[in-house]
């Protein structure tokens, strides 16, 4: 059992506030609550020790308590230095679940907390990872690589964050007995990954033959990527910009870099707020989609002096460069809704004059006197400056996460060290669990109709290659 103080939160006194909001969120998360009812008696996660690295929000608290209700033992950190909701972390800590998460952590604290995920409270090790962005997974892979003798990369960090991360790995190698990372890698039975960026890392490891354990790509479940990424961003992006700046959105020109699911939701969010929206894309298919939706598709170079608001949603690096920001209007708003902070060249701004306006809102002045307003230092604006996606859409994502954890834990040995997705039948089940809450009446196929299109009356209703 965890000790009484096996947590780090800003203020444990916020637990009651957090508990009240968790109770409200539960009524908006029908998928997770249905999973609790279905599986509580059978305890499919009994024996699972889940190391969770995912934004420590109110919605995540409902996920954590669902995993616990299904029998799991849990330790948790946030996957972003600004995304923690302190009252949510306090409520989870007060419930006896070890959590290490504070809004506004330093990068050093962030990685120290990540290391605590793997120092289990019974002296053992976790045997499952639930990840968002892949940092917990990378901790195991980088540590084992260095432990096996290939440690040269630790002396070649490519960023401030890598410098801190690699220093942590070096410290762990000194503090832990030889073979600790090997034992950790062997202990982990699988990982379920939440987001596009983390999934990209997993597929890269798998292609190189370096993935240490089976992985389920939760992001590409239809009920995650086509709902959380699209409809979640449609609501939460503008919320973050408004809370950060109080700016009038209507009439402004907004530039969205990237028109994947997150970019589509972001562009819709800005359009619905009255913005005139520009989009940049490298993919001709996505560019054509944006144009057919009525957006002007152009380049960042063209948009830099024109737009009032800039949003990156690409999953790539250096999308907004220092030169782009030099060309922007005075007090243009710059933010990111992709997982990592390197979509905007924030490092190139460090030698300029910074004025902090309020938490996660900075004004940066260039040599010519013009300024930009940077939100959340280029990290996730919807979680850094607001409260993230609404509970209902996160219920679908987190129901997928729970089902993925059950699948990996209860079917050890079934999966190779590759990346898998959940079957379509489970995707449809997740969707079905959310229909009653919003008053949907589903049509039932007759036997002759099902036979005519070659499907079962009860689904799956689409082939695996179908694109929603």
Swiss-Prot record:
A single GO CC term, please?
cytosol
Keyword Cytoplasm among record annotations: yes
Q: InterPro entries under this entry?
A: Adenosylhomocyst_ase-like_sf, Adenosylhomocysteinase-like, Ado_hCys_hydrolase_NAD-bd, NAD(P)-bd_dom_sf, S-Ado-L-homoCys_hydrolase_CS
What's an example Gene Ontology biological process for this entry? L-homocysteine biosynthetic process
Binding-site residues for substrate, renumbered to this chain: 57, 132, 194, 224, 228
What does the cofactor section's free text say about binding? Binds 1 NAD(+) per subunit.
Q: Which GO terms describe its molecular function?
A: adenosylhomocysteinase activity
- Family, per entry: Belongs to the adenosylhomocysteinase family.
Main location group: cytoplasm
Q: Which reaction does it catalyse?
A: S-adenosyl-L-homocysteine + H2O = L-homocysteine + adenosine
Give the metabolic or biological pathway.
Amino-acid biosynthesis; L-homocysteine biosynthesis; L-homocysteine from S-adenosyl-L-homocysteine: step 1/1
Which cofactors is this protein said to need?
A: NAD(+)
Which HAMAP family does the record associate with it?
A: AdoHcyase
Against Gene3D superfamilies, the record matches this protein to: Adenosylhomocysteinase-like (3.40.50.1480), NAD(P)-binding Rossmann-like Domain (3.40.50.720)
> Could you name the domain of life of the organism this protein comes from?
Bacteria
Its EC number(s): 3.13.2.1
Keyword entries, A-Z = Cytoplasm, Hydrolase, NAD, One-carbon metabolism
Q: Give the first-level EC class, as a single word.
A: hydrolase
The record's gene field reads: ahcY
Pfam family, any one: AdoHcyase_NAD
Q: What does this protein do?
A: May play a key role in the regulation of the intracellular concentration of adenosylhomocysteine.
Q: Does the keyword Nucleotide-binding apply?
A: no
Record localization: Cytoplasm
- This protein is called Adenosylhomocysteinase
Q: Which residues bind NAD(+)?
A: 195-197, 229, 258-263, 281, 316, 337-339, 382
């Amino acid at each position: 059992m965890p000790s009484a103080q096996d947590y780090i939160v800003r203020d444990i006194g916020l637990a009651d506030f957090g508990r009240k909001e968790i109770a409200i969120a539960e009524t908006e998360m029908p998928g997770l609550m249905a999973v609790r009812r279905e599986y509580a008696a059978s305890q499919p996660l009994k024996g699972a020790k889940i190391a969770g690295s995912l934004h420590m929000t109110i919605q995540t608290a409902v996920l954590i308590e669902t995993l616990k209700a299904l029998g799991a033992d849990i330790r948790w950190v946030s996957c972003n230095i600004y995304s923690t909701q302190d009252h949510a972390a306090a409520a989870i800590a007060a419930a006896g679940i070890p959590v290490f998460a504070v809004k506004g952590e330093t990068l050093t604290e962030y990685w120290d907390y990540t290391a605590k995920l793997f120092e289990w409270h019974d002296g053992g090790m976790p045997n499952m990872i639930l990840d968002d962005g892949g940092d917990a997974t990378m901790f195991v892979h980088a540590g084992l690589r260095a432990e096996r003798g290939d440690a040269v990369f630790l002396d070649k960090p490519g960023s401030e964050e890598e410098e801190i991360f690699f220093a942590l790995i070096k410290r762990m190698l000194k503090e832990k007995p030889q073979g600790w990372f090997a034992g950790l890698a062997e202990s982990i039975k699988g990982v379920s990954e939440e987001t596009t960026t983390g999934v990209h890392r997993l597929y890269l490891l798998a292609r190189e033959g370096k993935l240490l354990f089976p992985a389920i790509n939760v992001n590409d479940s239809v009920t995650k990527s086509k709902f959380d990424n699209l409809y979640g961003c449609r609501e939460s992006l503008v919320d973050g910009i408004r809370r950060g700046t109080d700016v009038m959105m209507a009439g402004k020109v907004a530039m969205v870099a990237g028109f994947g699911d997150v970019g589509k939701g972001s562009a819709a969010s800005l359009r619905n707020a009255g913005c005139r929206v520009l989009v940049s894309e490298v993919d001709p298919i996505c560019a054509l989609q944006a144009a057919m939706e009525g957006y002007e598709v152009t380049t960042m170079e063209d948009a830099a002096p024109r737009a009032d608001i800039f949003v990156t949603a690409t999953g790539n690096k250096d999308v907004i460069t220092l030169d782009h920001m030099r060309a922007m209007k005075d007090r243009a708003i710059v933010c990111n809704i992709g997982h990592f902070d390197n979509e905007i060249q924030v490092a190139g701004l460090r030698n300029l004059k910074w004025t902090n306006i309020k938490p996660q809102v900075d004004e940066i002045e260039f040599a010519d006197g013009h300024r930009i307003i940077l939100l959340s230092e280029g990290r996730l604006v919807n979680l850094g400056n607001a409260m993230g996606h609404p509970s209902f859409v996160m219920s679908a994502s987190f129901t997928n996460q729970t089902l993925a954890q059950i699948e990996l834990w209860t079917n050890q040995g079934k999966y190779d060290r590759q990346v898998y997705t959940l079957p379509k039948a489970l995707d449809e089940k997740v969707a079905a669990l959310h229909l009653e809450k919003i008053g949907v009446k589903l049509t039932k196929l007759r036997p002759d109709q099902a036979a005519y299109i070659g499907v079962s009356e009860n689904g799956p209703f689409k082939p695996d290659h179908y694109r929603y």
